[in-house]
Design a protein with these regions (language model features):
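Short beta-strand/loop motif that positions the catalytic acidic residue
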Residues: 225, 231-233
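Active-site loop/oxyanion-hole signature of alpha/beta-hydrolase fold enzymes
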Residues: 51-100, 277
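Catalytic active-site module of serine/aspartate enzymes centered on a nucleophile-bearing elbow/loop
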Residues: 254-301
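Acidic catalytic loop of the alpha/beta-hydrolase fold
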Residues: 236-240
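Conserved alpha/beta-hydrolase "nucleophile elbow" surrounding the catalytic nucleophile
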Residues: 27-29, 93, 97-102, 234
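Conserved HGGG/HGGXW glycine-rich cap/lid loop of the alpha/beta-hydrolase fold
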Residues: 9-65
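Flexible "cap/lid" loop of the alpha/beta hydrolase fold
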Residues: 110, 117-158
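Conserved alpha/beta-hydrolase catalytic His-Asp/Glu region
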Residues: 129-134, 151-223
Length: 301
């Protein structure tokens, strides 16, 4: 995997396609570029797609976290992503963010608003941040220490790949019959990838999202985010409250929301063909026709 020098660290990335339309893809917390392995090959070669890996994730450098995790703050990740674009000679591009990648995109929009064009968000952490839930650090500590716990935790990020009755406390998640061999292999690899994450990811991310929630500093600058936004949300999402997303879309000046009743947090691995179609239509200036309909999803699953 290629790496680019960004400040004092190296950031890893993968590229697909070529052309004047460039999309920077930013994964979510506990993630890596592999989260898009099923979707990226379905994208047209006329889109240049750059899938970046956060510091502390994947093949990127993993600096020792500061005591307050400030070097793993959302603003720091945003600066890394902008630095990667500089290193690759990309003056202007579109943005895509999944989950916590969404709030990283928002930081980039307020820092360099003229640099970015359209924004596609998938089940995003919003500019409001996220409250630190009771017991959350304990759960993350267990996931870090125990691969089985990590498997169970990540399964809730792609719930349609698993039998619903096994996604409960005390049960080991079991793949559903509809989960393809490729999806099963990828999910297993994504769990393996969590074994190398920095503590700045495991623990710095939730602490910084809680700081964002308490300060509302980024949310107070949403008036700067005038870029066209399309926000996708799977209604089976265990991780991001729908009311957060609805509130964000209401306050942004140029945003629309599409709901998908039969998808969870990660359309990119749950229904990659549907995700690739929406991604392609949006960034090639076509209005998405998916509309979250059951019929459309049924065909594409």
């Amino acid at each position: 995997m290629p790496r680019a020098k960004v400040g004092d660290i190296d950031i890893s990335y993968v590229e697909h396609g070529a052309g004047e339309d460039v999309v920077l893809v930013i994964h979510g917390n506990l993630g890596c570029a592999d989260w898009f392995d099923l979707a990226v090959p379905l994208l047209p070669s006329t889109l240049r797609v750059i899938v970046a890996e956060w510091r502390g994730c994947g093949e990127s450098d993993k600096p020792e976290p500061a005591d307050d995790y400030s070097n793993y703050a959302m603003a720091t990740h945003a600066a890394d992503m902008a630095g990667l674009l500089d290193a690759l000679g990309v003056p202007r591009c579109h943005l895509f963010g999944h989950s916590t990648g969404g709030i990283i995109c928002s930081h980039m929009l307020v820092t360099q608003p003229e640099r970015f064009r359209k924004v596609l968000l998938l089940d995003p952490v919003t500019p409001y941040g996220l409250q630190l839930a009771p017991g959350q650090i304990g759960v993350l500590t267990q996931m870090k220490a125990d691969r089985h716990a990590a498997f169970a935790g990540l399964a809730t990020a792609a719930p349609t790949l698993f039998r619903a009755e096994t996604l409960v406390a005390g049960e080991r998640p079991q793949f559903a019959d509809n989960a393809s061999a490729a999806q099963r292999r990828l999910f297993t690899r994504l769990v393996d990838k969590t074994r190398t994450l920095s503590d700045g990811i495991w623990f710095g991310t939730p602490h910084d999202l809680a700081r964002e929630w308490d300060s509302q500093a980024l949310a107070s600058r949403m008036d700067v985010m005038t870029h066209e936004h399309l926000v996708l949300y799977g209604k089976l999402d265990y991780w991001i409250p729908l009311e957060h997303v609805e509130r964000m879309v209401k306050h942004l000046k140029n945003a629309r929301l599409e709901l998908f009743p039969y998808v969870g947090h990660s359309m990119n691995i749950e229904v990659p063909l549907l995700f690739a179609r929406i991604f392609t239509d949006f960034f090639r200036n076509k209005r998405s026709r998916a509309g979250g309909s059951r019929a459309a999803q049924g065909v594409l699953q």
